[in-house]
Amino acid sequence: MATTAPPNGKWRRLFALFLPIFVSQTGQYAMNFVDVAMSGHASAEDLAGVAIGSSLWVPVFTGAGGILLALSPIVSHHFGAGRHDSITRAVAQALYLAVALAVAIVLIGAAAVPFILKQMSLDENVRHIAFHYLRALSFGIIPLFLYSVLRYFIDALGQTKVTMWITLTALPVNMLFNWLLIYGHGGFPRLGGIGTGYATAITYAYCFAAAAFAALKFRRLAPYRVLVRFYRPSWAAWKELLKTGVPIGSAIFFETSIFAAVTLLVGRFGAETVAAHQSALNFASLLYMIPLSLSMALTIAVGVEAGANRYEAAKQYCLIGITLALAVAAAAALFLSAFRSHVARLYTNDPTVAALTGKFLLYAIFFQVSDAIAAPIQGALRGYKEVNAVFWSALLAYWGVGLPLGCALALLTAAGAFGYWIGLIAGLATGALFLSFRLRAVWRRHDSGRAPCAF
């Protein structure tokens, strides 16, 4: 059974988990930025094609990939309880499930993507680039999902530095193949934005190969013999993964898709408003990397303690994580209050767009507070395997409160496009409040020794 850290040591332990995860998440964000920036230097049509393709791919990956995130609390529970053979078995079954999910996405995408693109009012060349970008990227979906499984296995054992280094080394790989395939250097064909898809697929394959090497060779990972010991596919094991993973993946999909929906709805207010909205949302997403990384670290820490039946220690990690997130949110809010105009000018030289971006960033301040509460609690509840509450929170808060309220304010009042952001803030706050009550209920249940509830 894994040992717990003393109360003061829990701060250091959580930070040691958080920092590499944060670097990894920021590295992934940087790869997306590089793809867009390098495509834009090819042509405006290449940039548009990659942007359209990416907007279709990201919600699918975050939703389907979120199913595999179930492996993290499962492994951390086994690790906390000292069930090491069960870890190897769970990883093997997750690898099988990853391949099945990836194949399903490729087959469904092959049929659905042409139809979806035809329904969009796109220039024919942009549509061509978007389709072939996604087709090129599809060659990397199986390696990406296999890498996701190995990453969650490695992270759940507390070895988050391994995936940090994989991400950091993947960034130059991605940049190199973008340079070769987008612009046609080194004897490669000049593919423009389509080359971004192939470069991304190659980067996914690199990440899987690097994670496989680490799993086989690193001292703290090799004893589990993943990729060496084989088991028959087990529906019972898949059922456990899906029971935990489908609510997680659905919650992530609801969260990512609401922002995509709002971006489409803001379009009615003109190009300048869309540009300002997208710029402010981009920066807010960058700041969100901090509470998101804390959330992932808490899933691991709480999962280990819950697996070992040390519920008081798990509660201490929850309180530490929320405290850290609130402190960071306060700092981010002060930064945005003081420097929002400077941030806006990083995105545009147009004074009208910059002024609008600054106003949107004022609303982003309220994002920080809600995210600082909701994100760590989401991670903690996943660590407890309390995933249904996270699912219902995302569905009701974003689509039941946030979007309807945002539409009403945007279309029926003078708030305009800012009404959508007010709706998002209300949704985030509702979700944070709901999750807070749910976490307190989990604590009370474990204090009294009652059985878990379905909701």
UniProtKB/Swiss-Prot annotation:
Q: What topology does the record note for this protein and the membrane?
A: Multi-pass membrane protein
| Stretches that traverse the bilayer | 13-31, 51-73, 94-116, 131-150, 162-184, 194-216, 245-267, 282-304, 317-339, 352-369, 390-412, 417-439
Q: What is this protein called?
A: Probable multidrug resistance protein NorM
| Phylogenetic placement of the source organism | Bacteria, Bacillati, Bacillota, Bacilli, Bacillales
This molecule's function is given as: Multidrug efflux pump.
- Family, per entry: Belongs to the multi antimicrobial extrusion (MATE) (TC 2.A.66.1) family.
Where does it localize? Cell membrane
GO BP terms in the entry: monoatomic ion transport
Keywords tagged on the record? Antiport, Cell membrane, Ion transport, Membrane, Transmembrane, Transmembrane helix, Transport
Native species: Geobacillus kaustophilus (strain HTA426)
**Which GO MF terms are attached to this record?**
antiporter activity; xenobiotic transmembrane transporter activity
InterPro entries reported for this sequence: MATE_fam (IPR002528), MATE_MdtK (IPR050222), MdtK-like (IPR048279)
